Each structure stands twice: as C-alpha cells, then as structure tokens.
Amino acid sequence: MTTVIRYGTRLEHLHEAVKLSPHGQTALSVWINDDIRPLPPSRRTWSTMTFIGWWSVWQLSLTNWQLGGSLVASSLSVWQTMVAVVLGRTIAAIVAILIGYIGAEWHIGFPVYSRAIWGVFGAFFPTLLRIGLTVVGFAFQSYTGGLCVTAILSGIFPTFFRMSNTLPASAHVTTQQIIGWAIFNIISIPVLYRRPERSEKLMIGMNIMSFAALLGIMIWSLSHAHGAGDLIHQPSQLQTSDSLGFGIMQGITTVVGTLSIALTSQMDFSRFARKPSDQVFGQWFTFIIIGSIMPLFGCLTSSATQAIYGEALWNPPTILAMWLQRDYSSTSRAAAVFAGIGLVSSQLALNVVDNGYSVGMDLSGLLPKYINIRRGCYVGLILGMALCPWELLASATTFVSVISSFSIFMAPFCGIHISDYWFIRQRRLKLSDLYHARPKGIYFYTMGFNWRGVLPWLVGWVPLLPGFMHSINPAIKVSVGADHLYALGFPYGLLSSMAIHTLVNKCFPPPGIGEIDRDDTYGTFTVEEAAKLGVNKDSTEEDSDRSLRRESREVLETKV
C-alpha cells in the first residue's frame, strides 16, 4: 500500500510539473490557455509591414523557387508558367485575406474557430489532421535545411568535404547529410523559443539573407552562362488549345495547392494584426509581387545552369554542391558558405513559420492545459525528427505523390471557413461558447459534434479519390475525367465545399446564428472594436479574470 501511495504521489507531482503555470488573465482549463484565448490588444502588434515580412518567409523559400521548375517540367513554357504563377498567387491572396478576417476581427486561431464549425469535440478531427500534415512538413523542410548546412560545412572544412560515408547504402542517407540535418535541428531550437508576436525583426533579417543568397545564385548563373540559356525560350510541349488551357489550369492548381496548409493557418497569424486592414495589403503585395519573383528566378537560373553544366539544376543546394565538386577553390568555397548561410536562414524561417508555429498552435488547441505554442513547437520538432524523412523518401516511391496531394484535404477546410464566416454567421461569433463544452453552449450542437461540417468536407475531396489513387499508382486505371478533376483538386475542393456548406446551413440553420457576447469577457477588444460590435467594455480586468475562472470551475465540475 505504501508503494502504491508513493507511486501515486510521484505521478501527481509529474502531472503538476507538466501542466502549464497559469499567468496573465487566463485561468487554465481543458479548453483555454493564454496562447489560444482571444488575443488582447497588448499582444496584437503586427502592422502591414509585419505581414509583408511574415509571408515573405514563404515567398522567398526554396519551395517557391522550385515551383517554376515543376511547372516547366509539366510541359508548360517558362512564360506560360509565369501566367499560372501570377493567377495562382492572386487566388491564394484572395483566400488568405478572406480567411484572415476571422483572426483579424475576433482574434482567434484555427483550432478555436474549428469548434464553431465542427462542434467543441468535433474540432479535434481537423486539428489532428493538420497536426499530422505539418509534422510531415516539419520533417522534410528540416531535411532540406540540413542539406544547406552540409554545403556550408563542406565549404569551410576540406576534411568534411572529403569525409567518407560510414553509413551503409541501406541507410539512404550519408554521414555528411545526417550531420547537417542534426545541426539544422539544433539551431532551430532557439528560434522556435520566440513567440510569434516577438519574431518580426528576426524574420526580417532572415528574409534579407534569403533574398541576397537567391539573388546572388541567379546573378552568378546568368553571368557564367552569358545569358539565360536556351531553356527560357523553349516552347510549350502542349500543342492543342485544349491541352494548353488545361495545362495552365493545372499549373494554377499546383501554385495554390502548395500553399494549402499555410492558407488554413492564416487566422493563426492574422489574429496578431493591430486592425483587420493591416493584413489585407501586406498579404496582397507579398503573394502577388514577391511570390511571383522567386519562381521566375528559379526558371532563369535553371536555364542558365543547363547551359553551364549540361543539365538544368532546380534545387539551390544542388547548385552549391556543384560549385564545390567542379572547383574546390577558395572562391568557390567562400561563395558556397555565404550562399549556404542565406539558404539555411530561408529554411529555418520557413520551418518555424509554416510548420513550427502552426503545429504549436494546433497542439495548444488540442491540449491547452499542458501545451502552449512554445511546447508545441518542440513537440513538432521531435516528431519530425522521429520520422527520418530520408527513410520515407527511400522506402516508398509513392510517398512524394502522397505529400503533394495533401492539398485535396486542406482545400475543403478553406471553403468551409469562408462559407461559415462570411455567408452563414455573417462575421458574428459568441466567443465565450468557444471555450467550454456545456450543453447550453451554441457550439455544443449534438454531443459536441456538428454534422453540418462533415458533409461539405467529404464532398470536397471524396470525388477526387480515383485520381488520387492513380497519382500514387499509375497502374490503377481511371477515366480521363477523373484524372482531370484530380488535377484541378484545390479549386474543386474549395468551391464545392463552400457551396455545399452554404446550402446545408441555409436549409438546416445551426443554433445561435448572429449571437455575440454582451460583455467583453476576455478583454479582447479595443474601445472602438467594442463599440462597433455593440459589446460592453465597462467591466474591469478583475471582472474578466473572475469570469474566466468561473468558466473553468464550471467545466471541471460538470466533468465534460
């Protein structure tokens, strides 16, 4: 009995140790902590320039650089590729701004708003799905970052460059690569420690280094090739107008699809905006202008490297490795090191913003009593390392096809969010009912689940399954129509889910449409915001704190 009591005491101490310490105005419960509560004005510090810097992280990434190459490889010409890029970026900007208004006006993120759509318990499903996708993204972006670190170390240390591979071929990774990967993950730790609202200057610095490195690589390639080479003038391989039109539409889908997870994360970051309009121009400018430059840089550089090396190099780390392999002089080594530092900055910023903070916020929404954004980032980092991305790439030739198809599951989420906020709820939410699971809450629905969110999501991706299976295994034969529908997966998923969600909710209206809180329970709004919404701003911070603690006690007492 004494032993049982002792172990019970230890478990109790462990439980208390892993729980978050309450601070600020939020009383911790299984539904709320400081990172997922509606943000108060003191934490909403992002301006238009912040959003330009924040989204530039993705637009200046290696993924965006390589986007042009993937479209040219699909038989489009370079200039047709740029048309698809600009149109795709325009669509993505519109979706981002519409979804961003949810966070900018009500200051909540994806996990919390999902409770309004799916129910307070049903929201666990989209949150878990997005956690899985972002962890996989974490793993692959870390691996790419490790390749950039390998280029830096190879340029600095001749012994590292000539290091023998001590791992067997069955490991699917070299000694150099695994060292670079480990170092990249280590240097990610202090960057992940910073809160999103305090990362503005750091991200701006990383963006500058990223742009300088990528611009330098392009200028070097154009200079050594004495121009852009022949690939830039290569005509499209699509001869008929029908095939060309479909090819461009497929390119637009690819452009938008690469941002699918980031688009669902939009409200996670727009909630930091000082005012809703701050996110509009910042994202419009970044998506269309900056977002269209990098694919063009990638196309020009690849065309030039084909003239230099006899093959088109689409991946910047590969270009750095080629510099060192062809000429291990002090000049080449210095160039590889400085360019590598810029590329590491790019990957580090992208992994933190696109994967780290996203999985941190989702885990915080899943287990708010134990995980905040910072802890969630570290959990994501550990899970990403455990996946060993080189094994995933080597063990299944279809894995990359599966990863690239994630957008078909994310597009319906985007459509449902736009429909729910703009057409059904008409931009009005009852914040207090998003943070408890008592049956009297309007977002409790039926036992905490809302069937109205399930049907539109299924309609948004189930018809794409035949084409999805064919992309994984070409031996599976499908009709031309099914293949074409899958190629247009993102716009289909977005528009069909939006239409079905609107129709279902108009025919079967959910409870509480148009309701908002009478009082500013969480100290969320400025005086101007409260007046516009008709919310009472007279209560003090102490009243707000007592209300939050009362909410938490009621949840625990009902054991819901």
Where do the language-model regions lie?
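Loop-to-transmembrane helix boundary motifs in multi-pass membrane proteins
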Residues: 170-181, 364-396, 441-463
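Membrane-interface "cap" regions at the ends of multi-pass membrane proteins
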Residues: 2-78, 208, 214-217, 224-228, ...
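Hydrophobic alpha-helical segments and their helix-loop junctions in multi-pass secondary transporters
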Residues: 146-155, 208-236, 258, 299-307, ...
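C-terminal membrane-solvent junction of multi-pass transporters and transport-like membrane proteins
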Residues: 175, 414-499
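Membrane-interface loop-to-helix entry segments
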Residues: 140-146, 179-224, 233, 283-287, ...
